[in-house]
């Protein structure tokens, strides 16, 4: 009885503001249980992978961690200096994030790992826009891996906005920030005016 009394009296000592927020939360859970559950699941799994894989924020959006860099070094025309033959990372996007349009000198292969499927928006060297789907639902046109050729501008977003996508990215010749360029919204829109809407959606208004 003393313990029960302590709990009740403690509850009444909570400030009015906290009581109001508590009742709002309870009301939200009762009214939108599936939405609240989805929010909890999103945080649970996205945060799990971010912590488990030691992911850090990526300048193009999302989170990443380096996983492999070949010891074999090569020199190729068009590259400033030597490069590792191959590199790989883990890359994670949450449903409210996107990978901004960017371009690379090397080919990149995306591999689906976990979570929801995502869409990649690829503008090739001829200016043609293509949408490709990375995910586990092969019958719905998704694929487990996708190659983005060097010289293409591309962006990505998660198809389920309450979920996340965890992928692996393999680059050959190996990744170097010297070979990577984030898209400038204004300049890209001028280069490809027919794709202005999608460019504005998947670029940042504040340029790096």
Language model features with spans:
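Extracellular beta-helix/beta-solenoid repeat scaffolds
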Residues: 149-151
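Short hydrophobic targeting helices and cationic amphipathic motifs
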Residues: 6-7, 19, 23
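Non-catalytic, conserved peripheral segments adjacent to functional cores
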Residues: 40-146, 155-156, 161-163, 173, ...
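Hydrophobic transmembrane alpha-helices
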Residues: 165-177
């Amino acid at each position: 009885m003393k313990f029960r009394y302590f709990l009740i009296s403690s509850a009444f000592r909570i400030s009015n503001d906290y009581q109001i927020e508590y009742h709002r939360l309870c009301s939200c859970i009762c009214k939108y249980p599936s939405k609240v559950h989805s929010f909890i699941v999103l945080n649970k799994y996205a945060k799990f992978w971010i912590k488990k894989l030691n992911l850090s924020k990526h300048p193009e959006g999302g989170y990443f961690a380096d996983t492999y860099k070949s010891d074999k070094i090569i020199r190729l025309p068009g590259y400033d200096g030597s490069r590792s033959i191959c590199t790989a990372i883990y890359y994670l996007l949450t449903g409210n994030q996107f990978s901004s349009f960017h371009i690379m000198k090397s080919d990149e292969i995306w591999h689906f790992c976990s979570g929801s499927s995502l869409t990649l928006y690829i503008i090739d060297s001829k200016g043609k826009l293509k949408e490709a789907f990375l995910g586990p639902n092969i019958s719905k046109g998704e694929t487990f891996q996708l190659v983005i050729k060097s010289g293409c501008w591309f962006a990505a977003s998660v198809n389920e906005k309450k979920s996340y996508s965890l992928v692996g990215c393999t680059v050959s010749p190996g990744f170097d920030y010297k070979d990577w360029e984030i898209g400038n919204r204004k300049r890209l829109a001028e280069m490809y005016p027919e794709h202005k809407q999608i460019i504005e959606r998947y670029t940042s208004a504040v340029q790096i």
